[in-house]
């Protein structure tokens, strides 16, 4: 099992990050709520990981905190919820927002997540509300949506490329191509990085 990676960020292509650990590059998929908080390319990072082995692939899912990883593990235990949907859930909302949605039985919010229909949302609430009892708030989770975007987050590439990357990331998270392109065009502003475009796009759809 690979439970933790400590190294240097080589590439950031939402929702995937490439991190160099001792000369080996690991591709790690991260929910956008965690991706937003990553350091810049070339800087050191520590990522808590969940390792999945399939017949056709070996996949790493990454998180900034152990608590976020543990929530992901609880989510994918739910009937009909796999890693891809778990990634989409924690990309559409922060860990704390998901916990509150389950506790409040907020089906309306949950069904806005790509891949989550009414039955899946109801199943998540039924299966997870007891398991999530005792999960704290405040310091346990730090909502990425509350963090102001800094100048360091503005990437040095054109707006067109940033928009294309944002659309590709949304499609990878389960949104339809037309829906992704439409929402990106609605939220994009001059000089926005792809990460900030994705953040605003996801926020507008939940």
From Swiss-Prot:
The entry's protein name is Holliday junction branch migration complex subunit RuvA
**Which segments carry the region annotation Domain III?**
158-206
The protein's matches in SUPFAM superfamilies, at most eight in alphabetical order, are given as: DNA helicase RuvA subunit, C-terminal domain, Nucleic acid-binding proteins, RuvA domain 2-like
Gene source species: Photobacterium profundum (strain SS9)
Region spans: Flexible linker: 144-157
Q: Which family does it belong to?
A: Belongs to the RuvA family.
Q: Which gene encodes it?
A: ruvA
- Region described as Domain II: spans on this chain: 65-143
Give me any GO biological process, just one. Answer: DNA repair
Q: Provide the GO MF annotations for this entry.
A: ATP binding; four-way junction DNA binding; four-way junction helicase activity
Q: Name the source's superkingdom.
A: Bacteria
- Region Domain I: start and end of each range? 1-64
Q: Where in the cell is it found?
A: Cytoplasm
């Amino acid at each position: 099992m690979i439970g933790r990676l400590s190294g240097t960020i080589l590439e950031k292509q939402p929702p995937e990050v490439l991190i160099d650990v001792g000369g080996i590059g690991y591709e790690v998929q991260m929910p956008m709520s965690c991706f937003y908080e990553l350091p810049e390319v070339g800087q050191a990072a520590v990522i808590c990981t969940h390792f999945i082995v399939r017949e056709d692939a070996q996949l790493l899912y990454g998180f900034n905190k152990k608590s976020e990883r543990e929530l992901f593990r609880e989510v994918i235990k739910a009937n009909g919820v796999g890693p891809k949907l778990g990634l989409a859930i924690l990309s559409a909302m922060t860990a704390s927002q998901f916990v509150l949605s389950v506790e409040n039985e907020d089906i309306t919010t949950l069904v806005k997540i790509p891949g989550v229909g009414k039955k899946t949302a109801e199943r998540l609430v039924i299966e997870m509300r007891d398991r999530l009892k005792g999960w704290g708030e405040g310091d346990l989770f730090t909502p990425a949506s509350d963090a102001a975007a800094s100048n360091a987050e503005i990437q040095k590439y054109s707006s067109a490329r940033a928009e294309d990357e944002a659309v590709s990331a949304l499609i990878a998270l389960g949104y339809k191509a037309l829906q992704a392109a439409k929402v990106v065009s609605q939220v994009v502003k001059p000089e926005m990085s792809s990460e900030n475009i994705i953040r605003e796009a996801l926020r507008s759809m939940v």
